[in-house]
Amino acid sequence: MSITENAIASAEAHSAHNYHPLPVVIATAEGAWMTDVEGRRYLDMLAGYSALNFGHGNRRLLDAARAQLDRVTLTSRAFHHDRFADFCTRLAELCGMESVLPMNTGAEAVETAVKTARKWGYRVKGVPDGMAKIIVAANNFHGRTTTIVSFSTDPEAREDFGPYTPGFEIVPYGDLTALREAMTENTVAVLMEPIQGEAGVLVPPPGYLPGVRELTRERDVLFIADEIQSGLGRTGKTFACEHEGVVPDMYLLGKALGGGVVPVSAVVSSREVLGVFRPGEHGSTFGGNPLACAVALEVVAMLRTGEFQQRAAELGEHLHQELGLLVGGGAVEEVRGRGLWAGVDIAPALGTGREISKKLMERGVLVKDTHGSTIRIAPPLVISKEDLDWGLEQLRGVLRH
Ligand SMILES: *Cc1c(COP(=O)(O)O)cnc(C)c1O
C-alpha cells in the first residue's frame, strides 16, 4: 500500500464515515497550493468552502494568531478581554450595522439567528407565544444541527434525524409570489442565502433579493442573509447582497471570518434586534474568544481596503469568461456564479461530479462536486491569474477526455 492508501485506510478504520473525501492526504499548504504526504502539489480550487478566502498560511493572519497565542487565548465571556470591543466595533462597521453576537461555527450563527428572530417576534413584533414562523428557501444549506436539518429539503441531510423542529415554512427559491403567499402575521423572519452555495452556486433571478427586501419591510419581517459562504469578498463585493443593492436586517457570517485558522462566526444586526437578549439567555464558551477576535479583526482589516473584493471581481470576470466559452460545446451545460465562485454543470455523459473531481485531482487540481454532475470552483482570492489559468486548462483537459 502507498503512504496515501495507508493513511486513508487507517482514517476509515477509526472515524465515522460522515464524509467521502477525495483520495488525497494533505500534509502542508501555502497560498492557493496544497502538498500531499507523498510530495505531490495541488491547486486548491475549493478553499475550504470559502473559509480560506485569504489562502493557506496567510502571513498577516498567522502573525495575528501567533501574537495572540503569546498573550491570552481564552477567557470565556465571564470576563471582558481586550480584543473583544475592537472586533465587534470593526466588524459592525464593515457590515454597516450596529451590533455583533459572536459564535464559532456557521451553524451556531444560524441557530442564534433563529433564536433572535423568534424572541424579536414575541417581544417586539407581538407574535403570540409559540406561533413564530420563519420562511426559508427550498434547496437551502444552513448547517447540520437538528433544528437546521428540520428545514432542509435534502433527504440526505434530514432522513432519520427527526423529530423535526417546527416553525419553518419552505418556499421555492427565486419565487416572490410564493414568498408573499407564505407570509402571515406570525412570520418573524425570512432566512436565505443570497446565492445558494451547496445547491450548486445558484444566483437568484435579478430583482428577487430587492423583492424579498421590500416584502419583508412591508410586513415587518426580519430579512436574514446567510452570507456564511457568499460573504467577505468571495463574489467580488464584501456581501453578495450588495450586487442587488440590498441591505438585510441581519448578516450571518462564518467561514472566512476565521481566516482558515480558527472557527469564528457572527450574527450582525441592529441594536434593536440583537438587544432582545438579556444575560444568560444565549451564549457559547468559545464564542468571541481572544484568539478568534484577534484573527477575525485582521480579516476585517484586510477586507476594509477592498483589495480582496476587487481581486475577486477581476479574476472572477476572467473565470466566468473562460468558463462561458465551455458552455454549448457539449461538455458543459451551464455555468453560474459571481466573482471567484462558479457552479459548473458537466454533461452527465462525461461522468458524475465525483468522477470529474477525481480526474482533476489526478491533474493536480482539487475541487468538490455537489449534487449530481455539478462541480464548484472557488479558489482562494489570493490565487494568481497564472495559477487560475493553469487550473482552467486542467478542467478543459478533463472535459476533452
Ligand atoms: C457552511 C455553511 C453553513 C454552516 O457552517 P458550519 O461552520 O459548517 O457550521 C451555514 N450556511 C451556509 C450558507 C454555509 O455555506
What are these language model-derived features?
Residues 1-401:
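Conserved N-terminal phosphate-binding loop of PLP-dependent enzymes in the Aspartate aminotransferase
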